[in-house]
């Protein structure tokens, strides 16, 4: 309960709202991609955890590094739940990375190009590219972990 008391109450409430928004956005994206209903809760949880990890690490790191770390958590949880629920990892991964995808960066890059502010367009575009590369590298990293690790962690020791 101390988490919600004192001067940190506003920060705590903001974090809870952001977590909730990320969960809802992730579930909406899962709905768009026709993920089976029984996985909506886990998809939302993965997206929310990814966003909170991003926000926490953004306090100390740059956006690309924060995105990389948060997406490692998203991919790890996606693989773990995929083994646990015996379904493809993409069920959780595609919707789980939704809060971390640099959509605003792409928008602002295009906006600055259209308004002929090429310096800002270059800066935004390069940052967006770094975030996109961070997402790809984090996916590659976690997919290098052996499948047996996820079987052990999920308590699912049978080969499928």
Q: For the regions a protein language model found, what residue spans apply to each?
A:
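The feature identifies polytopic integral membrane transport proteins across all domains of life
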Residues: 88-98
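Alpha-helical transmembrane segments and their membrane-interface boundaries
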Residues: 3-76, 80-83, 87-89, 108-160
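Proline-centric
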Residues: 99-105
């Amino acid at each position: 309960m101390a988490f919600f008391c004192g001067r940190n109450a506003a920060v705590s409430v903001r974090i809870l709202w952001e977590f909730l928004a990320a969960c809802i956005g992730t579930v909406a994206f899962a709905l768009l991609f026709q993920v089976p209903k029984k996985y909506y809760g886990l998809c939302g949880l993965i997206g929310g955890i990814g966003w909170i990890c991003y926000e926490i690490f953004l306090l100390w790191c740059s956006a690309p590094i924060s995105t990389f770390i948060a997406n490692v958590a998203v991919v790890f949880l996606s693989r773990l739940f995929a083994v646990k629920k015996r379904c493809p990892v993409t069920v959780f991964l595609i919707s789980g990375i939704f809060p971390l995808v640099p959509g605003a960066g792409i928008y602002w890059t295009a906006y600055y190009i259209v308004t002929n502010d090429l310096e800002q367009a270059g800066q935004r575009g390069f940052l967006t590219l770094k975030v996109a590369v961070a997402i790809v590298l984090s996916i590659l990293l976690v997919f290098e972990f052996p499948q047996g690790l996820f079987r052990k962690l999920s308590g699912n020791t049978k080969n499928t």
